[in-house]
Amino acid sequence: QTGTYFQEGVRGNDSAVRAWIVDLRGNGGGLTSAAVSALGAFSGEGDLIYFVDQDGESAAQRYSGKDLTDKPAIVLMDSGSASASEIFAGGVLGTGSGIVIGTRSYGKGVAQVLYDESNCPYLHGDAVKVTAYRFYCAGGNTTDRIGVVPTLYIPQDQAVAAARLLSGEKT
């Protein structure tokens, strides 16, 4: 639902903004499909994330719609931003759709597969998460153990003010 809500917000408010401020500080992630859908609002059609397994086999997650805005994204990040939030921020950088400000993100560049009763009949009420893939953002960069390096390092107590200034918002 997150990706759908994000796109509806962009579609309904694009004429009222000069830039989109996306605050992902402290966001531990979520579904990769939501990150791809949100990123697609800025980038348009294309392969926006790549998963590579231990054998080197890769698969792309593609966004097949058109971009919903020509305005840039200004993404706020910190060390608590991980996983799908890093996919979004790294994708913004990789597609040239905007900038990232704040501090370096967590650096979780891997994805897990969940095995539970729905796909593994011998787990009776239990579940197991197995790290199965390393992911690469649009542009080919991994965040694993590195994080997303911001375009501009900004102390967290100044990040929102900096984003507003960069967006051209009148203060």
Where are these regions (language model features)?
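C-terminal, low-ordered peptide segments at domain boundaries
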Residues: Q1-R18, D144-G168
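Cleft-lining beta-strand/loop regions that shape enzyme active-site pockets
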Residues: Q1-Y122
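Conserved P-loop NTPase
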Residues: Q112-E117, D126-A162
